[in-house]
């Protein structure tokens, strides 16, 4: 499979993860039911479904830790008052950058994807905010990481 096609599939998976996390965070819907409904309504390859599950469950299970990282990087923006899209985008990106131990997506690819999601689904200022938070986190936590491979 070509890089462009893989990147496009991963972009669609990240959109699905964003929408699932947003729904779960804004409602009382059970995360596993929302995820399974999405997989039923929008079939995808096994690899994409596994990536989606990893992003959704990983970002959700680690949200307390990820939210602390967000608040460290943006102390004037409490996570509880943050727009839901921005919060979900940041949780997904930070999960990929700081926690995901199945595969290591390059920093640049994670940030570019997060900024694109923020532009597509967030407010006028979302992409700048997301880029700023992720830039701060990368400087603080990942400055020594070698990322020579592109997604």
Curated annotation (Swiss-Prot):
Superkingdom of this protein's organism: Bacteria
Gene Ontology MF annotations: RNA binding
Key word Chaperone present: no
Disulfide pattern: none
Family matches, as InterPro entries: NusB-like_sf, NusB_fam, NusB_RsmB_TIM44
GO biological processes: DNA-templated transcription termination; transcription antitermination
UniProtKB keywords: RNA-binding, Transcription, Transcription antitermination, Transcription regulation
Keyword RNA-binding: yes
SUPFAM superfamilies: NusB-like
GO cellular component, as recorded: cytosol
Function, in words: Involved in transcription antitermination. Required for transcription of ribosomal RNA (rRNA) genes. Binds specifically to the boxA antiterminator sequence of the ribosomal RNA (rrn) operons.
NCBIfam families: nusB (TIGR01951)
Family recorded in the similarity comment: Belongs to the NusB family.
PANTHER family: ANTITERMINATION NUSB DOMAIN-CONTAINING PROTEIN, N UTILIZATION SUBSTANCE PROTEIN B-RELATED
Entry protein name: Transcription antitermination protein NusB
Organism expressing this protein natively: Chloroflexus aurantiacus (strain ATCC 29364 / DSM 637 / Y-400-fl)
